[in-house]
From Swiss-Prot:
Chain segments annotated as transmembrane: 38-58
Job of this protein: Prohibitin probably acts as a holdase/unfoldase for the stabilization of newly synthesized mitochondrial proteins. Involved in mitophagy; may act as an adapter for ATG8 that supports mitophagosome assembly. Negatively regulates the proteolytic processing of ATG32 via the i-AAA protease. Acts as a negative regulator of the m-AAA protease.
Homology family: Belongs to the prohibitin family.
Organism per entry: Saccharomyces cerevisiae (strain ATCC 204508 / S288c)
Domain of life per record: Eukaryota
Alphabetical keyword list: Coiled coil, Membrane, Mitochondrion, Mitochondrion inner membrane, Signal-anchor, Transmembrane, Transmembrane helix
Protein name: Prohibitin-2
Lineage: Eukaryota, Fungi, Dikarya, Ascomycota, Saccharomycotina
Amino acid sequence: MNRSPGEFQRYAKAFQKQLSKVQQTGGRGQVPSPRGAFAGLGGLLLLGGGALFINNALFNVDGGHRAIVYSRIHGVSSRIFNEGTHFIFPWLDTPIIYDVRAKPRNVASLTGTKDLQMVNITCRVLSRPDVVQLPTIYRTLGQDYDERVLPSIVNEVLKAVVAQFNASQLITQREKVSRLIRENLVRRASKFNILLDDVSITYMTFSPEFTNAVEAKQIAQQDAQRAAFVVDKARQEKQGMVVRAQGEAKSAELIGEAIKKSRDYVELKRLDTARDIAKILASSPNRVILDNEALLLNTVVDARIDGRGK
């Protein structure tokens, strides 16, 4: 039981004061009477007994704590003691102090999914006792109530909820899994007068075989997407070639019709080609001598064509 330093100092000062009075009475050179000696000794005993009684009759409840009292006569009292200093009957009553602040606890469990995959899952719970039910908690569970209850109910709820989902659903539907675990845990803990402020899944791992299978599936999906992209690209290139071929065919058809209607188009193309050949030869460092036939500039043919045209 906690005592304030001021109380002990007051008791010590009173004891020293009474002791100094006895010493002063004996130091005057007079022989004290037996009655006076017994009176002084009785006063010391009374003062010491009073200090001991007060020391055992008071106890403190710190912040964030609550207390109940066990009586040797009546058993566990239903009264809840709040923070502060309180009085009890020494040697008959015993204070039992509970920490009512929320405390975190991590519980790990190895369980199986609906598709028979093993998963390691860790659940973090933030729990505290129901203050109103502290006498019942002490009667049924004691002061280590969280050690007795939380590991078993958390494991049971985790196994029951995880068994409802496939391994892949634990990842894609994690919010739903967490909600079901929270609802079931809050309901189970309330039967033991334990309040849960927060429940969350902090860790989840699968077997190496399942992890490798998931990675292989992801790689296969990426390869399939890459192949689909290549096929789509080839299809687009093929369509482009068809369009170009159709354009070239249409162009050839138009050129043929133009030639049929007039030979001036052929002469224009011949002159353009001759000009291109001349530019290439002029820019070449080698000396080349060509006649009109090679340059497509046959003047005789040109004159003959001109004569026919006339």
